[in-house]
Amino acid sequence: MVKFSKVLMLMVLAGTVSAAFAAEGDPMARAVFYGALAIGAGVAIGAAAGGGAAGLGNAIRGVLEGMARNPNMGPKLLTTMFIGMALIETFVLYALLIAIIFIFTGIFDSKAGF
């Protein structure tokens, strides 16, 4: 666990240093910065998709258990499950949208003021 936290701290430090160098206009540092931004966006989308998949699995499991206990509640449970699944999927789509905005708008560019 200590080794993991050290590696994580080193990665965060490397990301901040590349952002500082990118502000100076060095082309290699800008390439590293945007590469790190792309990797971070991919990790964010992967984490959102993994969390969404776990949430969908739990929702389906709960509905199937409810249907097994009381088959007459099946249609009501299915309706509620589909609404919940739509809300879980919007979480993943929001993560994708935010990642696309970060990558293509240059929001962290030094000219933007951030």
Curated annotation (Swiss-Prot):
Tell me the domain of life. Bacteria
- Quote the cellular component terms of the Gene Ontology held in the record: plasma membrane; proton-transporting ATP synthase complex; proton-transporting two-sector ATPase complex, proton-transporting domain
| Any matching Pfam family | ATP-synt_C
Q: Example GO molecular function term?
A: proton-transporting ATP synthase activity, rotational mechanism
- Coiled-coil stretches noted in the UniProt entry, renumbered to this chain: none
Membrane-topology annotation of the record: Multi-pass membrane protein
Against CDD domains, the record matches this protein to: ATP-synt_Fo_c (cd18121)
DNA damage: is it a keyword of this entry? no
Q: How does the record describe its quaternary structure?
A: F-type ATPases have 2 components, F(1) - the catalytic core - and F(0) - the membrane proton channel. F(1) has five subunits: alpha(3), beta(3), gamma(1), delta(1), epsilon(1). F(0) has three main subunits: a(1), b(2) and c(10-14). The alpha and beta chains form an alternating ring which encloses part of the gamma chain. F(1) is attached to F(0) by a central stalk formed by the gamma and epsilon chains, while a peripheral stalk is formed by the delta and b chains.
Q: Tell me its family.
A: Belongs to the ATPase C chain family.
Question: Any idea what job this protein has?
Answer: F(1)F(0) ATP synthase produces ATP from ADP in the presence of a proton or sodium gradient. F-type ATPases consist of two structural domains, F(1) containing the extramembraneous catalytic core and F(0) containing the membrane proton channel, linked together by a central stalk and a peripheral stalk. During catalysis, ATP synthesis in the catalytic domain of F(1) is coupled via a rotary mechanism of the central stalk subunits to proton translocation.
Protein name per Swiss-Prot or TrEMBL: ATP synthase subunit c
Organism equals Sulfurihydrogenibium sp. (strain YO3AOP1)
In the UniProt record, the gene name given for this protein reads atpE
